[in-house]
Each structure stands twice: as structure tokens, then as C-alpha cells.
């Protein structure tokens, strides 16, 4: 697949503080790439450098193999969507969406053609005459996205665009965004601290920590084969067993619980159930290990057949293939 954006030895410093240490990254055309990490990890700074709102201290950013260092944001073939929608309150939905095309003096016939297309894409045709105050938060976000895609940018940059919405609405819009990206074929670069959001939408995820990309891979590879201790503990839930100079990561869903007097060959550890949390489709069971200052989490699903209670002594085990060995 064709490379659309390339970051070559990019570094960002503010005074003497290195915010983004030097690294390189290539992004493919039509890809949905998510920059995922905790607050302050540098993901928004990186996005702003791609957009042109911040300049890298060293290194170069290329779009279609052309350097962007001296190209202002408004001349880059990119648009950006923020968490704050920044809609014009006195304009209707269609007036907000058309604003950029009017500023570029695109012909009226072409404006209307593109407007009808994007209104269908974002499911706002019936709401085109409403003003922002007459819309829900999710509808306002659709307007912001429509305004960003109507001029067919090569790249769409999204800085936590769903962060202000409630959980159920976020879930719904995640699916809509992914389908929209597939239909349009536009490269999406998406910033979030929400792991579930990143997993649901991305072709690849770049997990960031302290300005560095710890790992970049597909959601499945990030989850099943973390390369660093940070990725293993930041993405999802994990049990980290530190023994013999290594870290072995085992996901809670891979931990099996057995009666303490069952087949000893299955057992790796013995312990006592310290707590259990009911979450509808599963229970999180916490086991305090014997002779170790460690609590292990296991997932128990409906139909497992054993109803463990707090205080029960249990044995735990897992397949060796479910361990991920990580550097210390």
C-alpha cells in the first residue's frame, strides 16, 4: 500500500524539555491509525505537528513525499476535527458544512453536489436546516466531521472527537466513524486515551508513552503480543508474574481456576479468593497467592460451572502458550 505520510527523525522540544524524542513513522494511504496513550504522552503534540500547528524542532514531515516544514496548516491537504466542535451558532447545519467551500469560492453547483453526498454519509439530510443548539452532541459532532470531509482532504486528523459524549453515544459513533472512513478511503489519524475506542476502530495503533512510540501494530497484535511491559499493563488488564529475571504477562481470561484438590499437573499457583466483582456477563475474581505479595485477576464467565466465593482456596493455572515474556 502507498505511503501517504512519513515522519523522518521527528523531535519536539519546548525550551530544554524533550516532549517527543526523535523517531520515524510511516502512515499508509487509506489507513485508520490511532495514537493511543495516557495524558501527557505527546500524542496531541504529534498530531499538531502533522497538522502544522506546531513545528518539529528537528526532522521533517512528508505528505506524498513532499516536505511540509514550510507549508502553513491551511495549505496542507488535511483537515482537523477537535473535541470542541467549534460550529457557528447562527448558521444552519448545511451552512456550517459549506463554510469552507464558500471560502475557497468553489462553484455553487459543486458545493451542492458535495453537500448532498456528505449529508448522506453522516446521516444529517433531515436536519440540514437546524442550528447547532437544536442538535444533540452526537449530531453536532457529525456536522463537524461533515465540514472536515466535504473538501475531500487527503488526511483527516481527529483529536479525541468523541471525548465529550456519553458512553453509549460514543460506542455508536465509533462504528459510524469506522464505516465512514472505509467508504471515503481517507487516511484517518486519530488521537485518544480510550483503549476500547482504539481497538474498535483502528487498522493500526501506535501506543505512546513519554513521547515515544512503544509499539505500533494491529489491535489484535497489540493485545495478544505486547512488546513492552508498558503496553502489556496499559492495554487491557494483565497479570504480571515476575520470576527468574523475567516478566510473564497472562491475561485474566486465560487464567483458569480449579478446586485445590484437583489434578496437580494443571496448577501453577495456589491462593485464596479475596474478592469477586459481578459485571453482568462475567465476574472478576481476585486471588491472593500463597507465599507471595501478589493478587491475580481471573475472569469467570456464566456457564463455567463453579461458583467461587470469597474465602475459597483455589488453584490457578494457564497454558504456557498464553504467557507473553517481556523484558524487565
List where the protein language model places each region:
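ABC ATPase nucleotide-binding domains
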Residues: 32, 71-227
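The feature captures the beta-strand-to-loop junction immediately N-terminal to the Walker
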Residues: 36-38
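ABC ATPase nucleotide-binding domain helices that frame the ATP-binding cleft
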Residues: 44-47, 143
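Non-catalytic connector elements of ABC transporters
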Residues: 247-328
Amino acid at each position: 500500500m502507498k505511503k501517504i505520510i512519513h515522519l523522518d527523525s521527528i523531535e519536539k522540544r519546548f525550551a530544554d524539555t524533550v516532549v517527543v524524542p526523535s523517531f520515524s513513522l510511516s502512515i499508509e494511504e487509506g489507513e485508520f491509525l490511532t495514537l493511543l496513550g495516557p495524558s501527557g504522552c505527546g500524542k496531541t503534540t504529534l498530531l499538531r505537528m502533522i497538522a502544522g500547528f506546531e513545528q518539529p524542532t528537528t526532522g521533517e514531515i512528508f505528505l506524498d513525499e513532499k516536505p511540509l516544514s514550510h507549508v502553513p496548516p491551511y495549505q496542507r491537504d488535511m483537515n482537523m476535527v477537535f473535541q470542541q466542535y467549534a460550529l457557528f451558532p447562527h448558521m444552519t447545519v448545511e451552512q456550517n458544512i459549506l463554510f469552507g467551500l464558500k471560502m475557497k469560492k468553489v462553484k455553487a453547483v459543486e458545493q451542492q453536489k458535495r453537500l448532498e453526498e456528505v449529508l448522506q454519509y453522516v446521516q444529517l439530510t433531515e436536519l440540514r436546516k437546524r442550528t447547532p443548539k437544536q442538535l444533540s452532541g452526537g449530531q453536532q459532532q457529525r456536522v463537524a466531521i461533515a465540514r472536515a470531509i466535504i473538501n475531500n482532504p487527503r488526511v483527516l486528523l481527529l483529536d479525541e472527537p468523541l471525548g465529550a459524549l456519553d458512553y453509549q453515544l460514543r460506542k455508536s459513533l465509533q462504528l459510524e466513524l469506522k464505516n465512514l472512513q472505509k467508504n471515503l478511503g481517507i487516511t484517518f489519524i486519530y488521537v485518544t486515551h480510550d483503549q476500547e475506542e482504539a481497538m474498535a476502530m483502528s487498522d493500526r495503533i501506535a501506543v505512546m508513552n513519554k513521547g515515544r512510540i512503544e509499539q505500533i501494530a494491529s489491535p489484535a497484535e497489540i493485545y495478544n503480543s505486547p512488546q513492552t511491559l508498558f503496553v502489556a499493563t496499559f492495554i487491557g488488564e494483565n497479570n504480571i508474574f515476575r520470576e527468574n529475571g523475567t516478566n510473564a504477562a497472562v491475561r485474566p481470561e486465560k487464567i483458569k481456576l480449579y478446586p485445590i484438590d484437583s489434578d496437580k499437573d494443571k496448577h501453577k499457583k495456589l491462593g485464596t479468593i479475596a474478592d469477586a466483582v459481578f459485571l453482568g456477563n462475567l465476574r472478576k475474581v481476585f486471588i491472593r497467592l500463597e507465599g507471595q505479595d501478589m493478587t491475580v485477576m481471573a475472569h469467570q464467565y456464566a456457564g463455567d460451572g463453579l461458583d467461587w466465593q470469597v474465602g475459597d482456596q483455589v488453584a490457578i493455572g494457564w497454558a504456557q502458550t498464553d504467557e507473553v515474556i517481556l523484558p524487565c
